């Protein structure tokens, strides 16, 4: 299936020198602690909580509308500690997700309306289907599909998943064009 052009109003997005496109309607708390490594798209009404701990996002990632990305925390007897959140390259996070993971590897697809529980680890080349809720501290192995509530193993992915995710994220970025370039 070929992706059509996705047009956006240039005044509604900020484009950085490294090619990141961030919606002006998104909220980046503690932006000095948020690193977007390049050609990443953050769409409208997203929230990235860099004020809690460092958030690092790799290259060619897409965070779609109304998703929340926040670092994981752990409760201790003396209070709460937040830990950095690392997201790899070529990660696609669909609409309405809440991501509270410790780590998301590269070439990962998170479906619509998912909740990734605190301190989850999503290894490279995995997929989380729509409406999945992963319990805290779940580890999703490489080349697996998780679905349901609670999120459980439901299938495997082919060895070409890495190439597929590279194609998807790069083509999405190339087709995400300002209205003036049409």
Swiss-Prot record:
One matching Pfam family: DCTN5
Key words of the record: Acetylation, Centromere, Chromosome, Cytoplasm, Cytoskeleton, Kinetochore
Modified residues (N-acetylmethionine): 1
Primary subcellular site in the record, as a coarse category: cytoplasm
Location(s) in or outside the cell: Cytoplasm, Cytoskeleton; Chromosome, Centromere, Kinetochore
Keyword Cytoplasm assigned: yes
CDD domains associated with the record: LbH_Dynactin_5
InterPro entries, per database record: DCTN5 (IPR047125), Trimer_LpxA-like_sf (IPR011004)
Coiled coil: none
Gene3D superfamilies the UniProt entry points to: Hexapeptide repeat proteins
GO CC annotations on file: centrosome; cytoplasm; dynactin complex; kinetochore; nuclear membrane; nucleoplasm
Domain of life of the native organism: Eukaryota
GO biological process, one term: aorta development
Purpose: Part of the dynactin complex that activates the molecular motor dynein for ultra-processive transport along microtubules.
Entry similarity comment: Belongs to the dynactin subunits 5/6 family. Dynactin subunit 5 subfamily.
Descriptive protein name: Dynactin subunit 5
Organism: Sus scrofa
